[in-house]
Amino acid sequence: MEIIWWGSIVHTIMSVSEVEKEFRPSNLQSGLNFEKHVEKLYIGLGYSVSTTPITGDFGVDLLATSNTEKIAIQCKKYATPVGPDAVMQVYSGGAYYGCTRFSVFSVNGFTNAATEMASKLRVELFNIKLAV
């Protein structure tokens, strides 16, 4: 399995094998399961993580908080690459929640437009390549 990070996570507490185990396709049957595994990843990195309401979440699925930062996270388990709407949503929703960082996770990559927008807005894009 390959994990490609288009952002930067400074501290790594979970080993690569632990991350690979979390992101096996059998563990990610639904978008909600994908969110739960991303949540576990951030908890492993030492963050306190809370979920937002399923509806009316302002484009943010998870909020990861440490002593120094608050991260807005959106998780997309799409069959196709994620577009710029997800980047706009997590950025604006994160501002609503008072976040200092913004991240979008995908299992099928990102469009060029999403990557370009994320670069301008400083939104981190994380593409999880699942082992088959």
Task: Mark where each language-model region is.
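Mixed-charge (Asp/Glu-Lys/Arg
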Residues: M1-V132
